[in-house]
Amino acid sequence: HAPVTTSWAGRGVLPETNALAIPMALIKLNNEVRNDADLVLVVGSRLGETDWWGKAPNWRHPSEQKMIQVDIDGHILGANKPATLAVLADAKLFLAALATELESRKARMNLDARQRQVAKYRETIRSERAKLDEKLQDMAVPMNPAHVAHVCQQVFPEGTTLVADGGNTAVWAMFFHEMRVPNTLLSTFKFGMLGAGIAQALGAAVARPGKPVCCIIGDGAMGFHPQ
């Protein structure tokens, strides 16, 4: 019953329709959740620039927050934020073992308090999502970019791989495309790099034969590709 936040690239590892998922687009709420926690389990993430390097004020100060970091690459452990406990392990194997252990301790956990906290977060998600979706009422010309990802999600079938290429274009796409199926997002989020979308879309099509791919490109990214 712990809330789950992700990096931008990690979106969809837990479907954002799950009650425990905190959508990455709600940045203020993500910061609140990360500050509320006295213990953070970081799995397969280096806590890079899109995670504010795990530092205050977007995260609780390390003196007030313990961190367990799990990664298969030892160079990642503790690189950007001191880890209270560093675990060199495969994420899937670690989480399976952890789930088994926690199940045996469930009777000793104060789940009611956790469920109330999660319910509070869910109410904030509904409220903030409604504010964002007000952009979709804007029918002006030129088009509000919020419509692009929103309409694409309506047109393409569930499970379509989304490729977002372009600085602000990728941000808008993340804000208005809900990740409902794991492993269906492909982009280059570090420092807003441009021009990789075409190759990523082709790669996604090859990796998942017969599955549709939606590639949203903007901010001049298409011009970078042929260069």
For each of these PLM feature ranges, what is it?
Residues L77-K120:
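Terminal amphipathic helices with adjacent charged low-complexity linkers/tails
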Residues S45-R46, G218-G220:
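Active-site metal-binding loops of divalent metal-dependent hydrolases
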Residues R122-G210:
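Active-site diphosphate/adenylate-binding microenvironment
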Residues G10-P15, G48-E49, G74-G78, T84, ...:
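Short gly/pro/ser/thr-enriched loop/turn and capping motifs at secondary-structure boundaries
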Residues H1-I68, R180-K211, H225-Q227:
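Glycine-rich, anion-gripping cofactor-binding loops and their flanking helix/strand elements
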Residues D38, T84, T160:
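Conserved acidic residues
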